[in-house]
Structures are given as structure tokens and as C-alpha cells.
């Protein structure tokens, strides 16, 4: 069983430990949060998200109340009733066991259920195939590919824009 709660500064140590190197850090946050993440840099990002309105960071806990993941709801766009997910990260020891899929489904349920969004979007770097596979397993589909979104270590990283709708979510989520 997974639980979701708002991010707390005490979660920063766990998040920092999930990121093994600068490449993994860039895949997670596009370098929008300092490396390595600290309570201060995560707190700053939380404040920025809060200032945008519906944005917030969340921590995902396992049955033993141990942090195993995090994500952010970055905005609710009222014009098109869309919520956007970002900063999705899973503890290395939780990967490959379906926990990421469940975490993403909980994030989607929050957006549809509590925020009333009609669609939920996210972006994923093309180099992060495991994450893209997880998002597809949770019901997201590709809508666009952007050739060059970030330069890292001499590489151009493209992104996939992905979306899930209420109707599609109902086929993937038994909530």
C-alpha cells in the first residue's frame, strides 16, 4: 500500500539518496533544483510551486511509512482544465516492482479526483525509457516528441510529451 502526503523538509535526505549521479539528477528535474538536492533547494522549489497556485511537491510512503517516491503537481491550467506532473522520482530499491506505476496512478487520481482536471500531462526525457514505460503502463500516451530540450554532457536530450484523459484513466485505474 502506498500513501501520499505533502513534501516535508525531512524528506530531502531520502530524495538526495535516490539520485546516484548528476545525469540521474538531470533526468529527474532538468537541473531546475540544485544538485545534490537539499532541504533548502527543495523548499525553494516548493515555494515556487505554491506561488503558481495549485503546485505542490508530494512524498510517497510505503506501508511502513518510509519514503519511496516523490512527484509534483506543477499547475492546474483552468482554460483547458489540465494538471501537469513533474519531478517524478522513485527510490532505486523500489524500481522494477510496479511501485512506480502505482505512484503515478495515485498522482493521476489526485489530479482527476481532488483537482477536477480533465487531462493530466507530463514530460519525460527520451533517455529515460524506464520512466516512459512506467507512464505508459499507468495509462499515459505519447502526444509529441521534442528533439532538443536539454544539453547534458555534450548530449542533446529530447522529450516526450505524454497525456492521460479521464476516460483513458478509467481503463487503467480501479479506483
Q: Where is each model-derived feature located?
A:
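Extreme N-terminal starter segment of soluble prokaryotic enzymes
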Residues: 1-2
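C-terminal "cap" of GNAT-fold acetyltransferases
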Residues: 83, 118, 125-129, 148-175
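Glycine-rich acetyl-CoA-binding "A-motif" of GNAT/NAT acetyltransferases
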Residues: 65-69, 130, 156
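Glycine-rich phosphate-binding loop
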Residues: 98
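Conserved active-site alpha-helix within GNAT-family acetyltransferase domains
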Residues: 101, 126-144
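Acetyl-CoA-dependent GNAT
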Residues: 6-12, 17-95, 104, 110, ...
Amino acid at each position: 500500500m502506498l500513501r501520499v502526503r505533502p513534501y516535508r523538509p525531512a524528506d530531502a535526505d531520502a530524495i538526495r539518496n535516490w539520485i546516484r549521479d548528476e545525469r540521474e539528477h538531470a533526468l529527474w528535474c532538468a537541473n531546475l533544483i540544485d544538485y545534490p538536492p537539499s532541504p533548502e533547494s527543495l523548499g525553494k522549489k516548493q515555494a515556487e510551486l505554491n506561488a503558481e497556485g495549485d503546485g505542490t511537491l508530494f512524498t510517497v510512503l510505503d506501508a511502513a511509512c518510509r519514503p519511496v517516491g516523490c512527484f509534483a503537481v506543477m499547475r492546474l491550467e483552468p482554460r483547458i482544465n489540465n494538471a501537469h506532473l513533474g519531478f517524478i522520482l522513485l527510490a532505486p530499491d523500489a524500481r522494477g516492482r510496479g511501485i512506480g506505476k502505482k505512484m503515478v496512478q495515485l498522482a493521476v487520481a489526485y489530479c482527476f479526483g481532488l483537482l477536477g482536471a480533465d487531462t493530466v500531462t507530463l514530460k519525460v526525457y527520451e533517455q529515460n525509457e524506464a520512466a516512459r514505460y512506467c507512464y505508459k503502463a499507468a495509462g499515459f500516451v505519447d502526444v509529441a516528441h521534442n528533439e532538443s530540450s536539454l544539453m547534458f554532457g555534450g548530449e542533446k536530450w529530447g522529450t516526450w510529451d505524454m497525456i492521460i484523459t479521464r476516460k483513458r484513466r478509467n481503463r487503467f485505474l480501479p479506483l
